[in-house]
């Protein structure tokens, strides 16, 4: 494969900034700007008989660097979120594979914005934010994949696993010989699971976490936290446990009658609204509504004239 500028391995190969971290001899983490935190994400580079790039949210400059040093043969998206697909346009003549669930709208910023926001004004704000923060440009997919698809790059093979909840089109990829699970936005971050879109579902998210756990991975690679090799079961417990923590917080807040607007102003899921406040408030409301529906179904909350109140004190 020749000289490898930018690969950060135990041998200490030199490049500044170091943007590639070896996971296996053929798989590398392409570090995202801002340490992979939103609005960026880490990407995955496969260098085998086929060179493939998974997700393009690491930053436009890093993609241009990659294009010069390790030009991919194809691009794959894990799901249609704007911090995972904004740089698809950097590779205009390559095959672009996306989940079958989002093939019809991936790469079209007008369609994605409307799907993720539900109002014309919020859609406009979303487009403005995404273009400014990520460098997003439209780039249409050429093909799609589904649950159980096997990507074969040579000696490296990845199995696509549909893991909805975060979005309807969220996938994980498994490298079966080494037990590596690429979980993308099931990211094991301290914030916990995110499910703020109309097609996001808490129950699906919990089921997807259990699907990952059942793989018994020896390593997890996430889009925002990078490589995780220690205490994987415990990390999954803590991450998934945030859902129950949020519901306890909601129940504590509903010790007296509260309106939905009071809950949004809390806020009870986001700690605050540090940017794009209208969008964050919208997603806070969506996530609160999903929790309230679950709590209503369980008889833990009841509707009132003004909003909601809990029916019993939450368990510790």
Where are these regions (language model features)?
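C-terminal regulatory/interaction regions
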Residues: 4, 249-316
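Metallo-beta-lactamase
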Residues: 8-25, 51, 58, 103-247
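Short glycine/proline-enriched coil/turn segments at helix->beta-strand junctions
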Residues: 48-50, 68-73, 89-95, 176-179, ...
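Conserved S/T- and glycine-rich ATP-binding loop of Class I adenylate-forming
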Residues: 78, 163, 295
């Amino acid at each position: 494969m020749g000289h490898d500028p930018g690969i950060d391995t135990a041998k200490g190969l030199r490049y500044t900034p170091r943007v590639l971290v070896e996971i296996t001899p053929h798989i590398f983490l392409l570090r995202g700007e801002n340490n992979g935190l939103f609005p960026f994400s880490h990407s995955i580079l496969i260098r085998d008989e086929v060179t493939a790039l998974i997700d393009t949210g690491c930053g436009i400059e890093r993609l241009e660097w990659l294009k010069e040093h390790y030009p991919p043969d194809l691009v794959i998206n894990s799901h249609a979120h704007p911090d995972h697909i904004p740089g698809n346009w950097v590779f205009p003549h390559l095959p672009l594979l996306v989940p079958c669930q989002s093939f019809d709208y991936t790469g079209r910023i007008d369609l994605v914005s409307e799907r993720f926001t539900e109002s014309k004004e919020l859609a406009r704000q979303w487009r403005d934010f995404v273009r400014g923060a990520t460098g997003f440009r439209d780039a249409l997919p050429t093909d799609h994949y589904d649950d159980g698809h096997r990507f074969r790059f040579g000696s490296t093979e990845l199995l696509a696993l549909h893991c909805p909840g975060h979005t309807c089109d969220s996938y994980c990829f498994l490298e079966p010989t080494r037990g590596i699970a690429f979980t993308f936005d099931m990211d094991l971050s301290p914030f916990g699971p995110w499910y703020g879109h109309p097609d996001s579902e808490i129950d699906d998210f919990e089921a997807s976490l259990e699907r990952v756990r059942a793989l018994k991975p020896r390593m997890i690679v996430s889009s925002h936290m990078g490589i995780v090799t220690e205490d994987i079961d415990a990390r999954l417990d803590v991450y998934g446990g945030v859902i129950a923590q949020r519901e306890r917080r909601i129940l504590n807040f509903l010790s007296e009658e509260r309106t939905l607007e009071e809950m949004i102003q809390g806020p009870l899921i986001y700690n605050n609204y540090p940017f794009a406040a209208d969008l964050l408030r919208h997603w806070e409301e969506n996530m609160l509504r999903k929790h309230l529906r679950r709590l209503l179904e369980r008889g833990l909350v009841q509707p009132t004239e003004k909003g909601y109140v809990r029916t019993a004190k939450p368990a510790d």
